[in-house]
Amino acid sequence: MTISYLPKEEHLLEGTDEQMKRLTSAGIPRTDVEVKIFDDHDSELPPGKMGEIVVKGEVVMKGYWRNPLATSETLRGGWLHTGDLGVMDEKGYVYILDRAKDMIISGGENIYSREIEDIILLHPAVHEVAVIGVPDETWGEAIKAIVALKEGQKATKEDIINFCKEHLASFKKPKSVEFIDAIPKNPYGKVLKRELREKYWAGEARRVR
């Protein structure tokens, strides 16, 4: 950030392309905090490679109150795993690009996909479901349910949304529903949510809002 006090008629403030690009970054770490980018095996990645943003320092929490499981999942090897995906450039600037944790931020509310998925799976016509966040001009992200129905079963978008309204807070119900034949998974059975999100976020520099 640059603060100046000059008559606009006689001064023009310009930045290089490199400097202007860094306006989209989260900045550089504080001197008392270490920030690195880790891969899926908790190994450090070189500049420019996308991975999970991890943090270490005296200002980092020691753990979650009375929740050792969450603590062990988030604090590993002395590093706090933020759940955000990003890159760090050669100068140490960090860019947040996507979210590793299965969370949607809509209208300022943190919404966990798993909670919504567990409810939708209770619907008698639903075989599988994946809940993702898609871009929304008003809410930042909107909740979208991608549903595979059981063979021979039928359900409409309204059926799924109304079912969620009966069991969830209003802000957690999906704003849209898409029906597909099968939910894509990797060989280990993990749902490929990034693949599902891609067509909605294509063209966006960042996968978070």
Q: Which residues fall in each region the model found?
A:
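Conserved ATP-binding loop and adjacent catalytic segment of the adenylate-forming AMP-binding
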Residues: 1-33, 47-51, 61-62, 76-77, ...
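Short beta-strand-to-turn element immediately C-terminal to the catalytic PLP-Schiff-base lysine
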Residues: 3-8, 38-39, 56
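Generic short beta-strand
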Residues: 20, 35-36, 85, 182
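Generic structural signal for residues in well-ordered beta-strands
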Residues: 35, 129-131, 177
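AMP-binding/adenylate-forming catalytic core of the ANL superfamily
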Residues: 41-44, 57, 62-66, 73, ...
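Acidic/polar alpha-helix N-cap and adjacent early helical turns
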Residues: 198-209
